[in-house]
From Swiss-Prot:
Gene transcribed to yield this protein: yfeO
A Gene Ontology cellular-component term: plasma membrane
Protein's membrane topology: Multi-pass membrane protein
Protein name: Putative ion-transport protein YfeO
HAMAP family given in the database record: CLC_YfeO
Amino acid sequence: MLHPRARTMLLLSLPAVAIGIASSLILIVVMKIASALQNLLWQRLPGTLGIAQDSPLWIIGVLTLTGIAVGLVIRFSQGHAGPDPACEPLIGAPVPPSALPGLIVALILGLAGGVSLGPEHPIMTVNIALAVAIGARLLPRVNRMEWTILASAGTIGALFGTPVAAALIFSQTLNGSSEVPLWDRLFAPLMAAAAGALTTGLFFHPHFSLPITHYGQMEMTDILSGAIVAAIAIAAGMVAVWCLPRLHAMMNQMKNPVLVLGIGGFILGILGVIGGPVSLFKGLDEMQQMVANQAFSTSDYFLLAVIKLAALVVAAASGFRGGRIFPAVFVGVALGLMLHEHVPAVPAAITVSCAILGIVLVVTRDGWLSLFMAAVVVPNTTLLPLLCIVMLPAWLLLAGKPMMMVNRPKQQPPHDNV
């Protein structure tokens, strides 16, 4: 017979598995549709019209029209495509289900149109809203927070293709003063995360790791080098933190989301022309291209880092529906490669992983998630002790500093961007 504790843990197991599978399937469907639309906009249409895919006019035109289209969705859809991601954390309160169709359409348009944001925030919002709405009907005794935790864990597992990130994040979130052991509370979220990760793995494998020269033995000088790299990445990220609320306030003075996002798309188009096609989209596939291109110089990597960071700020400030983690990882990779090219004596594995750690820490203010992203992009067990040590001064630098988020104006309704 099972102990009462075990029976308690098993109560939410089936709902957790169902939520994890559903979270992954929603992500997969959205990404497949966005990929098909991206192929149409950036491959088939230019080829049919006899226009080069990297033509400045095409890049500016597509991104401007993408902004206008997203603005129309936000302006006229019920619920105005959910909350403005610039004003929300990654895991937020559930939104009304009526806002979800507009949010999904706005996300797909942004992903396909080349906007420098990832899918993580909108997908998280959709999955949490559906889990809370459906769960409250089927199992009304389970509170909203439980459904929120299960949906966010399933989504994290689906996004990263592994339950490890969910385990790290929720180990700090659920570690309260309760007498219930931590792993009892982690059981159902990890079931959801594992189900989400395994379902994603059936259709595609998220490819984060980069082909970077293997790092051998850690030396004391490497710790100092890594700390300096992380500090540089944090400094770059804090410039974006300073710019975001100011640009957001400036853009939203226009009140009309169609105008705001149209102008935002036009600016993103100009940045895309300067940075080239590799600086567009969410950044995961593009960072693979960046590493594979041996022709890039120090100045090229610097330009890509600056352009991508600027595009991230503009996209978030304009109200595009998307997340900031994936493009931030691209910025970290570009910064790391730039610093390695500038000082070849410091291994690329150190510069890239520590730059990712620093910039993701600025964006998320989550130490575990930052360590996870650095470790999966540069998968090397020898780096783990170094990254843990480098995290300490990085965390000190950011203690008490503002987050990369905009304070919501008091007069703005919770899910209205007009």
